């Protein structure tokens, strides 16, 4: 019973209500940034980093999706594709900034849809090789029912959806935190982690750059140093690192 109790506590600690957030546009730049939120989140959680890119003249657009309802492939087709087609087709470059499972969504999307004007991708805290927290929660049928099909897709099993995607064929960098506010999740994760994803499992072999910061999973995208580093990567293909 104790393990079920911990699972329920963990579920409520990460659940948030989704809400709509209309795309914001700034046409001073002819480059587009598409922001994709993570599991159990909404586009409002990326508002600060979106505003940061707006300040530098990028056209910024948000993808909102129902992570408790849709599988990752459905999210790509139903939610990401229309945002890209409607808002970014005539831009010189289309960049992506993602948080958490949003990184898995964009990996699938860019594996299926080849954009001739694709720029660079920044993944914030992506479970690129799965999450032990997803493994733990998916043991419980009630949690599976409440959280939907994406939960198992984010598992660390070699046969899981995320581990079937292969190595990305686009230019991307990963920013990962190594601080946690969630001791329960961090007990589940065997390595250094951000409270949701292990540092090791955020990495893939062909990353263009990697940056580790002392931030938590939930608030990583709100940190000034992360916003600055993300912009620098979009512009140069490298992260701006503190001395």
Features from the language model and the residues they span:
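Sec-dependent N-terminal signal peptides
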Residues: 3-12
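A short loop-to-beta-strand scaffold at the N-terminal edge of the catalytic core in hydrolase folds
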Residues: 21-23
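Proline/glycine-enriched tight loop/beta-turn segments at coil->beta junctions
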Residues: 25-32
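Serine-dependent carboxylesterase/thioesterase catalytic core
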Residues: 33-39, 44, 53-66, 72-169
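Histidine-bearing beta->alpha loop at or near hydrolase active sites
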Residues: 65-70, 214-218
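Helical cap/lid subdomain of alpha/beta-hydrolase-fold lipid enzymes
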Residues: 111-243
């Amino acid at each position: 019973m104790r393990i079920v109790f911990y699972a329920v506590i963990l579920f409520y600690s990460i659940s948030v209500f989704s809400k709509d957030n209309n795309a914001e546009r700034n046409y001073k730049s002819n480059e587009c940034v598409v922001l994709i939120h993570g599991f159990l989140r909404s586009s409002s959680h990326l508002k600060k980093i979106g505003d940061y890119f707006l300040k530098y003249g990028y056209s910024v657009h948000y993808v909102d999706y129902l992570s408790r309802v849709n599988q990752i492939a459905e999210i790509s087709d139903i939610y990401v594709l229309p945002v890209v087609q409607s808002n970014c087709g005539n831009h010189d470059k289309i960049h992506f900034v993602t948080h958490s499972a949003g990184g898995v969504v964009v990996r699938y999307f860019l594996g299926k849809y080849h954009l001739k004007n694709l720029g660079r991708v920044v993944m914030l805290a992506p479970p690129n090789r799965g999450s032990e927290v997803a493994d733990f929660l998916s043991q419980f049928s009630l949690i599976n029912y409440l959280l939907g099909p994406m939960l198992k897709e984010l598992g660390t099993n070699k046969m899981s959806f995320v581990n079937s995607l292969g190595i990305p064929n686009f230019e991307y960098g990963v920013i990962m935190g190594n601080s946690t506010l969630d001791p329960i999740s961090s007990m589940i994760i065997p390595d250094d982690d951000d409270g949701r994803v292990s540092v090791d499992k955020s990495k893939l072999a062909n990353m263009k750059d990697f940056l580790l910061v002392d931030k938590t999973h939930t608030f990583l995208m709100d940190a000034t140093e992360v916003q600055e580093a993300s912009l620098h990567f979009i512009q140069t293909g490298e992260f701006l690192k503190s001395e």
